[in-house]
């Protein structure tokens, strides 16, 4: 199987420069990623995902540094015990946004049907994200509806069917959560990468 990428009608409207440092946006014709033969630095390449790196890394994330939404996992692989009383660490969505020079860019990760996204917090393996990813949407103006689910004022691009390309969901063959420290947890690499303004793990999974 392969992913389905859907671009909005306004996807190509952000090719200008932003902020006092003149950070480059993206050209719609470059899609998610277009190789620039003059560089091997991901954020210097062409396309939306490298531009996401450039903009999201320096954005102000105070409005939404990252949060779960939707139904919580009733039976997580890693039970948080006491730590679970300190917040919400699972859901069917994980979203974050950041504002830079008037561009309020964000992403929403949706769990695959019947799955949940989870964060282990201080339980072992600590600070690890797992769960099967179904889709990721990037957009502008992150909002929550009356049920607490995230959506965008303006969607830019959605990547669907991520659960069909062999990602491990952050779980090994024994059904155990793969520690983030191994570098082998696809879900953690993608979601935590996006949270930190690094879409290279997502592109590596797609490429």
Q: How would you name each of these model-derived features?
A:
Residues 1-207:
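RTX-like calcium-binding, glycine/aspartate-rich low-complexity repeat tracts
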């Amino acid at each position: 199987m392969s992913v389905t990428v859907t671009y909005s009608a306004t996807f190509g409207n952000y090719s200008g420069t932003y902020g006092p440092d003149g950070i480059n946006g993206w050209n719609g014709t470059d899609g998610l990623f277009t190789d620039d033969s003059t560089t091997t630095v991901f954020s210097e390449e062409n396309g939306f995902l490298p531009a996401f790196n450039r903009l999201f890394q320096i954005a102000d994330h105070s409005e939404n540094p990252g949060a779960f939404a939707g139904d919580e996992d009733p039976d997580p692989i890693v039970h948080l015990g006491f730590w679970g009383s300190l917040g919400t660490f699972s859901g069917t969505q994980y979203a974050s946004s950041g504002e830079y020079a008037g561009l309020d860019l964000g992403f929403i990760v949706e769990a695959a049907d019947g799955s949940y996204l989870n964060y282990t917090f201080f339980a072992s393996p600590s600070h690890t994200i797992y769960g099967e990813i179904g889709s990721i949407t990037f957009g502008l103006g992150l909002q929550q509806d009356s049920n607490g689910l995230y959506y965008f004022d303006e969607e830019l691009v959605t990547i669907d069917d991520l659960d069909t390309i062999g990602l491990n969901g952050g779980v090994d063959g024994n059904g155990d959560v793969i520690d983030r420290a191994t570098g082998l947890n696809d879900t953690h690499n993608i979601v935590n990468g996006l949270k930190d303004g690094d879409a290279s793990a997502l592109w590596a999974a797609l490429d």
